[in-house]
Amino acid sequence: MLERIKVCFTESIQTQIAAAEALPDAISRAAMTLVQSLLNGNKILCCGNGTSGANAQHFAASMINRYETERPGLPAIALNTDNVVLTAITNDRLHDEVYAKQVRALGHAGDVLLAISTRGNSRDIVKAVEAAVTRDMTIVALTGYDGGELAGLLGPQDVEIRIPSHRSARIHEMHMLTVNCLCDLIDNTLFPHQDD
């Protein structure tokens, strides 16, 4: 058991090192995309399933409340949090449309969809991205593995942050770290603080 624990930590560290080498440009582009949307008076819609949904909620909560320092709230909506809306849509047997319907109702040109999917193949996330494209929204996608179907939907203005791993647990860990990086970059760009 102790050896298995060491393996988990070692894999996580190795994935972080690989991501630190591969992802800074994509994370920087994503942060600037989010910042520009907010500066233009737009909002960020976020979606994901399971642990990816928790990461989407964490991002939205960090925008609306704060990340590490006090600042005004920023407009972000996690589409996986309203149980009444979610169950109304799925009750009509529209499981794949659970986020797309919300994107079509709430999204506008200039808004950003933060789509989080470990493999990039979740039908409801793919449909949300397709809906965002029809609304002239920009997409920031957090993926893993080979990016899946989601990666193929992205245009030149969109940003994919693909975790260099084929282990779901490691991808989820790195998605959380990436969300924290994005929150930090957004805060420090919009509300730079002086170190005394």
From Swiss-Prot:
Q: Is Calcium included in the keywords of this UniProt record?
A: no
Offer an example of a GO molecular function term for this protein.
carbohydrate derivative binding
Q: Does the keyword Lipid biosynthesis apply?
A: no
- Gene Ontology biological process terms in this record: carbohydrate derivative metabolic process; DNA replication
Matching InterPro entries, A to Z? DiaA, GmhA/DiaA, SIS_dom, SIS_dom_sf, SIS_GmhA/DiaA_subfam
- Organism domain of life: Bacteria
Supply the Gene3D superfamilies for this chain.
Glucose-6-phosphate isomerase like protein, domain 1
Q: Which UniProt keywords apply?
A: DNA replication
Q: Which residues form the SIS domain?
A: 34-196
Tell me which SUPFAM superfamilies the record gives: SIS domain (SSF53697)
- Oligomer status and interactors: Homotetramer; dimer of dimers.
Q: What does this protein do?
A: Required for the timely initiation of chromosomal replication via direct interactions with the DnaA initiator protein.
> Which HAMAP family does its entry note?
SIS_DiaA (MF_01157)
Q: Which family does it belong to?
A: Belongs to the SIS family. DiaA subfamily.
Name of this protein: DnaA initiator-associating protein DiaA
Q: Which organism is it from?
A: Cronobacter sakazakii (strain ATCC BAA-894) (Enterobacter sakazakii)
Q: Which gene encodes it?
A: diaA
